[in-house]
Amino acid sequence: MLIITDGAKETAKIASAIAAALGDVKVEVKAAGDFMGNDILPADVFFLGCENPEPETFAYLADVLRHINLAGRLCGIFSPKSEKAVQYLSALVHDCEVALHPEPLFASSVDSVKTWAQNVVSGSFCTRNDSK
């Protein structure tokens, strides 16, 4: 599993909480600035988080996601506070055809991180991201 963040302090806290919530599963947490295109290939499940929409560190990640098909992979998105950041992340993964969890995680709901993260991993929502 892979968690990619913008590297912001609050986003990193949520990423750590998600990784901890997944228990014994191997989870790699990466700042987007350290992301390489082949990091995402072995990940059946990945999470993306940012504090604000269009962080500069996401430029390469955005380019990769525009040119890769990740159909069948599961994805959860999160932000410490920004609905616009979540809208950005949702649009970012739209073209790569991931199965996007319909409910993003916000910092205000960090108490429910474990349930949310496990739901993303289980794929029980199984809705392909068809929104435009």
Identify what each model region corresponds to.
Residues 4, 10-13, 17-32, 37-132:
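FMN-binding flavodoxin-like domain, especially the glycine-rich phosphate-binding loop
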